[in-house]
C-alpha cells in the first residue's frame, strides 16, 4: 500500500516499517520484514538509500538490512541507527554509518536528521529533505488505550 503526496511516495512495508521515495533519495524506516515484497522494486531505483532503525527490538530492526549493500552494489546506502542497537548486540559499530541518541543531529548534502525521544526504547526520527520534514515515531506511543479499559 502506498500514498503519493507532493512528489513524495510513502510505502507501508510492515509493522512500523515504511519507505519514503523522493526525487533525490529513498528513506527506509524500521525495516523488520517485507511480506508483500515491495522493497526490491523501491531499492532498485538507483537513488541513495538512507536506512533508519529506531531501536534494538526485533520488530524495528533486522540484520537483513546490511545485506542490501551486497544485493545492490551500485547504490549508496547509509545506515543510521539508534546507538542502543550496538549496546544490545544487534550489530557492530562498524556496520552502522551513523549511530545516534536522543538529541543528536547529523546531515550530509541530501538530508538532515535529528534523533528525538521515545517513550519506549531508542529514538524517533525527524528528517528534513527537499524542503520537507518527515517524522517517524519508532516506538513512540502515547499509550492512551490503557486508560480506556475500566479497572476491575
Question: Language-model features: where?
Answer:
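Internal alpha/beta domain cores that form substrate/cofactor-binding pockets in large enzymes
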Residues: 121-152
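Metallo-beta-lactamase
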Residues: 2-6, 74-132
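Active-site-proximal beta-strand elements of phosphoester/diester hydrolases
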Residues: 9-12, 26-30, 110-118, 133-139
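Structural beta-sheet core signal
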Residues: 51, 79, 135-136
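Pre-active-site segment of Zn-dependent metallo-hydrolases
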Residues: 2, 17-68, 140-152
Amino acid at each position: 500500500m502506498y500514498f503519493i503526496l507532493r512528489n513524495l511516495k510513502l510505502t507501508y512495508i510492515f509493522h512500523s516499517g515504511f519507505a519514503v521515495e523522493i526525487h533525490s533519495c529513498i528513506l527506509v524506516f524500521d525495516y523488520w520484514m517485507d511480506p508483500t515484497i515491495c522493497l526490491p522494486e523501491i531499492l532498485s531505483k538507483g537513488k541513495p538509500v538512507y536506512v533508519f532503525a529506531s531501536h534494538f527490538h526485533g520488530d524495528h530492526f533486522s540484520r537483513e538490512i546490511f545485506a542490501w549493500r551486497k544485493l545492490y552494489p551500485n547504490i549508496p546506502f547509509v545506515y543510521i541507527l539508534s546507538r542502543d542497537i550496538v549496546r544490545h548486540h544487534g550489530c557492530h559499530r562498524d556496520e552502522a554509518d551513523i549511530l545516534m541518541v536522543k538529541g543528536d543531529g547529523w546531515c550530509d548534502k541530501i538530508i538532515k536528521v535529528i534523533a528525538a525521544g521515545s517513550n519506549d526504547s531508542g529514538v524517533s526520527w525527524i528528517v528534513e529533505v527537499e524542503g520537507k520534514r518527515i517524522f517517524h515515531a519508532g516506538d513512540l506511543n502515547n499509550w492512551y488505550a490503557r486508560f480506556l479499559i475500566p479497572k476491575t
